[in-house]
Curated annotation (Swiss-Prot):
It comes from Alcelaphine herpesvirus 1 (strain C500). Keywords: Host membrane, Membrane, Transmembrane, Transmembrane helix. The keyword Transmembrane helix applies. This is Gene 58 protein. GO terms for cellular component: host cell membrane; membrane. Pfam families: Herpes_BMRF2. It is found in: Host membrane.
């Protein structure tokens, strides 16, 4: 019996990726459009530094929600977003009201990131790629709007609301789908009680199963952080591109969608390509144009995230019957993203 692919579920998981990215997009809009320097005002500091800090805080937060009532959260998010953009456009207390609305909405939008991971990552692995692809598509769309200065027009925030709406429709389809229900059943032990309906590994059990991958992820992070510090200090590749560099800091959420073949060998291949791009930037600053150096920087980041994606895939395979695997993967992604973001931001300020 051959496996069939549900194309409606593919579209739904792709849309769910749009919804999951809403918190990152929200932070991106304020950090790039409403902020010109991370140390200019306290509002700018808030917009730029909120993403790594909130990601670190979210690791320690437990979220339990009734999926059928999340429509109220959607209305709240859209209402706050609309009020924020209107306040900014009409210059209504933008120094106090807008930052306050930003924080409230950012924290509540993080709930979508958590619940979307929890639902989609219990479905078969093929749907993970479309979820991550939707996440990446949302970030790319907003990046293009910024690149072509469409944010200066009257429709500058339309994509945010569109992604939220279609994302919620897709999310509602996914959590009601049989694939999600079967995914939860896969995590049930043969014998279970009321208190232990699902297999839930402890932190020590996870460390025992996925220790090698976690060590590799840590060493890749250290290498990438050291590389970014070196490039900030000894090259000008990051000069003037902080607006667009922001998106490279959250690649652990979505770059796995572009990987065709994932293995330890491919982890090594991606790492070598990333290292090569780093040395080309560092040593060939006078041989390449500004655009070419920016392209090499993009290659360096994407290959790094692809190497991480291969390792995260191996962790998911090893822990496929663990009910908390989706949240564990999300926590690892948030930790890696936040530490890299903090490293780059501090390096830019200290040079």
């Amino acid at each position: 019996m051959t496996k069939s692919v549900d194309y409606q579920l593919i579209a739904a998981t792709f849309s769910t990726g749009l919804l999951a990215s809403s918190s990152i997009v929200w932070s991106y809009i304020f950090a790039t459009v409403f902020s010109f320097s991370s140390m200019l005002t306290w509002q700018s500091v808030l917009y730029v530094w909120s993403l790594p800090i909130v990601q670190l805080a979210a690791i320690f937060c437990a979220v339990r929600v009734n999926f059928s009532r999340l429509g109220l959260l959607l209305l709240l998010n859209c209402g706050i977003a609309f009020l924020s953009f209107i306040s900014w456009s009409l210059n209504w207390s933008i120094s106090v009201l807008v930052p306050g609305l930003f924080v409230i909405n950012f924290l509540s939008l993080m709930i979508w990131l958590i619940v979307c991971f929890d639902v989609v990552y219990l479905c078969p692995e093929i749907y993970h790629k479309y979820f991550e692809l939707g996440f990446l598509a949302s970030l790319t769309i907003h990046y293009c709007f910024n690149q072509f200065e469409i944010y200066l027009t009257n429709v500058m925030f339309a994509p945010f609301f569109i992604c939220m709406l279609f994302g919620y429709i897709g999310f509602s389809h996914v959590w009601r789908h049989d694939m999600y229900i079967f995914g939860k059943m896969r995590c049930k032990p043969i014998y279970y009680t009321k208190r232990a309906k699902y297999i839930a590994f402890s932190a020590w059990q996870i460390m025992d199963v996925a220790l090698f991958e976690l060590i590799c992820l840590w060493f890749l992070l250290l290498a990438m952080a050291a590389g970014c510090i070196a490039l900030v200090m000894f090259s000008e590749v990051f000069l003037g591109v902080s607006t667009y560099l922001y998106l490279f800091m959250v690649g652990n959420f979505c770059c796995g969608s572009l990987i065709i073949y994932r293995s330890y060998v491919m982890t090594a291949v991606y790492s070598v390509v990333s290292l090569t791009a780093f040395f080309l930037i560092l040593m060939g600053g006078y041989l390449f144009t500004k655009a070419q150096l920016s392209m090499l920087a993009a290659v360096m980041f994407f290959c790094y995230f692809h190497a991480n994606g291969c390792l995260l895939y191996r962790i998911k395979k090893k822990l496929h019957r663990n009910i908390t695997t989706p949240r564990f993967i999300l926590n690892v992604c948030m930790l890696l993203n936040a530490l890299l973001e903090i490293t780059v931001l501090l390096a830019q300020k200290l040079t």
